[in-house]
């Protein structure tokens, strides 16, 4: 039986949401390991081809003022570039404990350290996994479309209508 990689990614997000300061790195490393699986390499290469993580981080850090929590991430306009940056960011955070702690403290500030990590998870990682799955399943940038809902209601009549059968 094959394991659904997207369900495994979602499980990592759930684990990260419930993690403590002492153990948040394990689900983050698991997430990065799953994202680097062999089946996703071509998609990842396509997403990261036009993005530079260090430039993005430098531009974002320039927005920080003297007030804690004032830094704002400077995302590009293209959805694929945003996904690529988030992918590189998750990989870097999984590799470097100090970077992950400082990044969450700078851009997702809260007085409680674990709350900074949970803010990062809920506002960056969870949407990334959702959008990444959509991107991979479509193999390109999905174009939003309006679909009319189709009714799945079934009308069942209970009774004894023998004449209708003949």
Please place each PLM-identified region on the residue numbering:
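Conserved N-terminal substructure of TIR/SEFIR domains
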Residues: 128, 138-166
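Charged interaction/catalytic cores of defense and host-pathogen modules
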Residues: 1-137
